[in-house]
Amino acid sequence: MRQKLRVAAYAVCVRDGQILLARSPGPDGTPEWVLPGGGMEHGEDPYDTVRREVTEETGYRIEVTGLLGVDSSRRVVPGGRPPRRTDHQGLRIIYEGEVTGGELRYEVGGSTDLAAWQDLAAVPGLTRVRLVDVALRLWRERPPHGRLEAPESLSRPRRSNEE
């Protein structure tokens, strides 16, 4: 089985009771809301990654104001030629950010198609990725160790069809 590690950095930007989110097509094509952010390029510092990604996806420049925590997941996905499974681990670094400049715009030709401020109270009703909830809990609770709870058994990866 192939192994793959993806490291990414995301920002929680909250102002006036709203959070900055981006919209991305989900695995089945259904749009879902995500945090602005994304994968690190080789040799890039995660601090620089989150600033670059927020600008690419929203048009805003941010100041990183804190490190909220880290989220990790692991899953096995089928696929490839010849057919073989991939044991995929994702490591997501979650920062707090404050918008310092730029103008809200949509990413053209990227992984997202819309950026918007969403009311914090409306987030539970949005179609969103799990990371949005994890990041909001980190932002609200501020655990001193930067972790909400032990990740879902990283020693036993979940299959892609498991909830």
Can you name each region flagged by the protein language model?
Residues 74-104, 138:
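Active-site-adjacent beta-strand/loop module that shapes the phosphate/pyrophosphate-binding cleft
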Residues 1-19, 39-41, 96:
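Conserved N-terminal beta-strand and adjoining loop/helix that marks the start
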Residues 3-5, 32, 83-91, 109-112:
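A generic structural micro-feature
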